[in-house]
Amino acid sequence: MSEKKVFVFGSFTEHETRSFFEQKPTKDPQNSKDKCVGSIQFGSLNLAAENSSVNTNGELKKGEADGTVKSAGSQERLDASRPASSDKNNDSDAKLPRKNSLRVPEHVVQNGIIKEISESNKSLNNGVAVKTDPIGLDNLSMSDGESDPVYKASSSKFQALDNEDFSSDSSSGSIQRKKNLKVPTESVPPVKDFTPRGLINAGNLCFLNATLQALLSCSPFVQLLQKIQLQDIPKADSPTLAAFSEFISELDVPSSSSIRNNVTVVEAGRPFRPAMFEGVLRNFTPDVLNNMSGRPRQEDAQEFLSFIMDQMHDELLKLKEQSPKVTASKSSVISSANDDGDEWETVGPKNKSAVTRTQSFVPSELSEIFGGQLKSVVKAKGTKASATVQPYLLLHLDIHPDGVQGIEDALHLFSAQEDLEGYRASVTGKTGVVSASKSIKIQKLSKIMILHLMRFSYGSQGSTKLRKGVKFPLELNLNRSHLVSLSNESLRYELVATITHHGWDPSKGHYTTDARRKNGQWLRFDDASVTPIGTKLVLHDQAYVLFYKQV
Amino acid sequence: MTLSRSSADDSTNNANRSYSAVAGTDNKRKRDEDSSDYVGVAESLEMLKKQEIDADHMAASAQQTLISWRSGENSRSLSSSGECSSSNRPESTRLQIFVRMMSGGKTIVIHAEKYDTVEKLHQRIEWKTKIPALEQRVIYKGKQLQRENSLTYYSIEQDASLQLVARMQSTEHPVAWQTIDDIMYTISRMYKGENLQSNINEKIVTFFAMIPVESDESIAKYLNIFSNSSVPAALVMLYASSLERNKSCAKSSVKLFLSNCVALPKNQKNYCLPIVLEFCKLLRKVCPDQKLYVTCRNTLGSMLETFDNPHGVYNDQYETFGVEIFPFFTELTGLLLNELAQNSGPSFCDFQKVSSFWQQLRKVIELKVAFPIPIVLPMQSTALEAEIRHLHRLFGSLLTTMDLCMCRVESSLADKEVGNSETMSSSWSQYLSILKIINSMSNIYQGAKGQLAVMLNKNKVSFSALVVKFAKRGDDHQWIFEYKEATNFEARRHLAMLLFPDVKEDFEEMHEMLIDRSNLLSESFEYIVGASPEALHGGLFMEFKNEEATGPGVLREWFYLVCQEIFNPKNTLFLRSADDFRRFSPNPASKVDPLHPDFFEFTGRVIALALMHKVQVGVLFDRVFFLQLAGLKISLEDIKDTDRIMYNSCKQILEMDPEFFDSNAGLGLTFVLETEELGKRDTIELCPDGKLKAVNSKNRKQYVDLLIERRFATPILEQVKQFSRGFTDMLSHSVPPRSFFKRLYLEDLDGMLRGGENPISIDDWKAHTEYNGFKETDRQIDWFWKILKKMTEEEQRSILFFWTSNKFVPVEGFRGLSSKLYIYRLYEANDRLPLSHTCFYRLCIPRYPTITLMEQRLRLIAQDHVSSSFGKW
């Protein structure tokens, strides 16, 4: 009985292969018609095989299993046949039939019951899995274009198959990961590339719109949002996370406009109102009654950015607290840090090394992206040096001195040594004030470095805005002198977004965002308006907040 | 100003951040609980550390002792011991931290305590840098620090580096926003149960002090801050909370707000009205039975009284405004109905609130309702439909209730006449005003005025009594004349007299006149016409030359005498009516004398002054003259008493059979009038080509109308105009010329000018006379009244005139005079003639021995020529 089964399947495979090789050299239109006829014949043969298997085994369960597999196979054939017929003159026409022929053995193998055949199936499966990915991507793009429910169903099945391959074998999973790494080199865009869409300003909301558009250009942050989107976020406990989750879902909806990757022409999606952030705004400014429409006043974009990052950090930690493992690791982190501090303090009097105090974030996904560490060292006359390590989310750069003409100058000023007035060596003692100096350097870099140029200040005339031009590069190479010590971290950063305040004084104005897309194109987001701009316009020297991504 | 504005910028957002901190409280508290386990471990480590420190410091102190001993300086020892004592502290709470500036590239050192608040940190920074605390933002570890939290809350430790940042913020009134933020923040904390000192009232005063005055638009924007921030809702919510402390605080804040609103100038107060209305709506939902709601509703009512800019404040929301104030009007009207039913009110204040709400509602209805007014019920869909239906029901209730009240008034008046000395109840004082509102409502609905007229006519006695008692000078009584049928003579007279200024009888203000009896008319003319109306408004001070007497009696005599001269036909100023010799109308022939038009102005002033001083001058006006003064048209029936012959002729012309009339060729009449004036005959055409136009049955009505007008009205047109001008001079300012006479019927004017029509009642006279030196039972008194009854009416009036300078008795009899009459005894020779003091209504007679002698003496003074002098004896 078993020999008969092997014989039947093997004979079909050989027959199909022979017919393919015979037809290939000719490449005539008439031959394509013959292919269609051939596919029909294959279908009828499968039906005959089904009947024979039922008759031989006499079990209903096996019959049902075979039926489902065959139905999936038949749909695949239909999908394969249509692109073949539509792309008669395409060069890839020769490749598609090969894939079709290869796919049939896969399903035949799946029908197998004997263990010997299953062993050989695994090796075949690995090879086939690698090759099926391009097919799925092509179909996905086609389904996007045609919006046919049949194609959508088939594309979802392809995804399901891919997932099955992932879960079935760990070795195949590793192969998939390597393939993902190669995707950029193949110039195939990832699945989650959002269409740029404007945000409607219903009244003094440009600070919100500008901040959101800038954050969307930080790919690690977007990945975090996609991860959050899959979770069920309680809106009452985590209003900020819920708002961002809804925001990403709104962006994920395909818009009617099609995408053309062209430097001069960009078709953006339909602008929408970020109404999901109403709760966040109410927490940000509880005194303002109408947060989304007819808002009576403007706000500082950097202040709002700090606020939502702070809120997200707290809400992410709150989600973590629901898991006992994370709690254990959290407490260990806190205790270890403090233990180190105590040890250094006790060693201090006996040695001449510096006393170091460390403050750090309780880590969250957000602080992993935007968070870094600064180390400040205070050197006082007659006493030992004192070092303090503390985290940062934004670097606030002073741009007021005349010597600051660009970002490099501001960073240099940031980490320059300065003298302290009124410093006391011992807080508990009655010793007098001594001369001291202090310097700050970066101990740990963040994946996304946010530079806040402090344009708003307070002078003898009251609140003022500094309209001075400050140059910033598209690629920023951090000077090693700004760092505490050498490390394996990359010092290269590339500009991904800027927020600009337009206006002459701090009591009024407008915010816009320049953001870079994955294909390197720069767009200006002015509330509901999305326009492409050149790098010269991006590098205007009036920016307020800069977003740099580590390369 | 710049500094203040900038300060508010920072404070506003810092207050905002306070709320966000509240949202994050749960997270932070949980983290604190997690870190509590570590605190125990830290304590044990700290103890070990302390032991080591103590050992180390003991060695150090020993060394310093040796050093000081070697140098022999005691001061070092003291310093050393101080250090030891401070070093022995278990743990220090002092912090030294670094704050990086927002500009200038400088870092400052701040010394603080661990448990200091961030607010205190801001103050230290301000002290060092002169940057106002409200202008600062401090960031540490990516967080912006909230003012009310402590440094420990943010885990700020030794040598921490903080960043100072400024901000941009756009708002037109930063200080106001900051003030409102503070209020909202305080309310929020109090509502959560925190025990803190409330500064809401101070903030409210600050908010009011900064209201702009430039333009309505800026006022509206400023006050919108209060509304947009939901302060009314927050305060009402605080008032409704269970904590008594919160309740009393909210109550005082709401009351303070209301009192500040009322104290504002008008243009600012207008824009506060929406906020007060919002308070009313909220309190009505939360606590409709409590005193605070009543206070708020009353404030809204008083503000509506002076609300004169609805279009500016509400613009296109005017209809909504009407809908929103209607529930309060309904509520107050319900209270009013209750008080009326129980005969316990309403007071003036209660009524004033209903009235102010109604005035605004009426404007809304007149402007917004699509249907023409009056409205026919049931109505189709329109604006304010439900309110208008409800209002109609209120009109019905008010009408029914007032009907009951008027019946009650009539019963009280009847009791009073019987002998009950009960005075008018004070609760009646607002009845007239309530009826006025009911009249205003009746303008809206068809048939409603008829219902009101029926009710008023049924209660005519009450209505008239209310008018006489409570209609005041300065109020608007025009609506009463729409129901003239429901008033009586006393009510109409009262309303007419309100048009005159009040006579004060202040000697400084009086217009003095010194008249020679022999030149009475000419001198009086010069005194009256030569004076300004203002001078005459103060009243008259009359004195005859070569006579000692002065006072109201002399004035009354002067009025009588000067009218006798004016209306003497010999002077050709006025003519008597043909049928009623007592009635006068201007003489058409008076135009011959060039000065006579001025005399008609003089006459108008004299008649007005006589009415003002309530003196009956005994002259009656002809009906035609009266109708012209009132600006009314003369009809055929009106000339019945003026010219009976002509009346009968015209009546025959109109009533003759048409065929017979035409067959006789219109009696040969044409449209002409034959007149005779000062001996000259003339034929006047009544219309163009009147001579050629024959009278027939079709145009005879027109002929009669034209004839009457040409015969009676046209000849005295100029004289009537002059009289009217003089009369109007004596009325209060801004009174229309014809309004006085329109308020009266001719019979009313008769009563005011001549008094009662009936002969003098001796019994009434006697009932109002008292005696001095005589007893009522003395025989001389008995003789006196017997003699008086035997006299003719003319002789009786002469005695009365001698006694009081009044020749005519008012319509209501002797009680209408200003005081009672008196008979005094003369203690002189028994055969003397009687004396009188007309100012005091005093007649003095000796104790006559016989009735014959008394009769002789009384008849002597009854002669006219004898009684017309003072002090010639």
Swiss-Prot record, chain A:
User: Which keywords describe this protein according to UniProt?
Assistant: Hydrolase, Protease, Thiol protease, Ubl conjugation pathway
Task: Write down the species.
Answer: Arabidopsis thaliana
GO MF entries: cysteine-type deubiquitinase activity
The family database entries (InterPro entries) matched by this protein are listed as: Papain-like_cys_pep_sf, Peptidase_C19, Peptidase_C19_UCH, USP_CS, USP_dom
Spans annotated as Disordered? 51-104, 163-188, 329-349
> What is the recorded name of this protein?
Ubiquitin carboxyl-terminal hydrolase 24
Q: Which family does it belong to?
A: Belongs to the peptidase C19 family.
Asked whether the keyword Hydrolase is assigned, the reply is yes
Annotated active site residues, numbered on this chain, are C206 (nucleophile), H510 (proton acceptor)
What's a Pfam family this protein contains? Answer: UCH
Main role?
A: Recognizes and hydrolyzes the peptide bond at the C-terminal Gly of ubiquitin. Involved in the processing of poly-ubiquitin precursors as well as that of ubiquitinated proteins.
Q: Where is the composition biased (Polar residues)?
A: 329-338
Per the record's keyword annotation, is Hydrolase included, yes or no?
yes
UniProtKB/Swiss-Prot annotation, chain B:
The protein's predominant localisation is cytoplasm
Q: What is the disulfide pattern of this chain?
A: none
Q: How does it assemble?
A: Interacts with WRKY53.
User: What do we know about what induces or represses this protein's expression?
Assistant: By jasmonate. Down-regulated by hydrogen peroxide.
Q: Where in the cell is it found?
A: Cytoplasm
Residue ranges of domain Ubiquitin-like in the record: 95-171
Active-site residues (renumbered): C839 (glycyl thioester intermediate)
What this protein is called in its record is: E3 ubiquitin-protein ligase UPL5
One GO BP annotation is: response to jasmonic acid
Annotated region Disordered: where?
A: 1-37, 70-90
The HECT domain sits at: 532-873
State the deletion phenotype. Accelerated senescence.
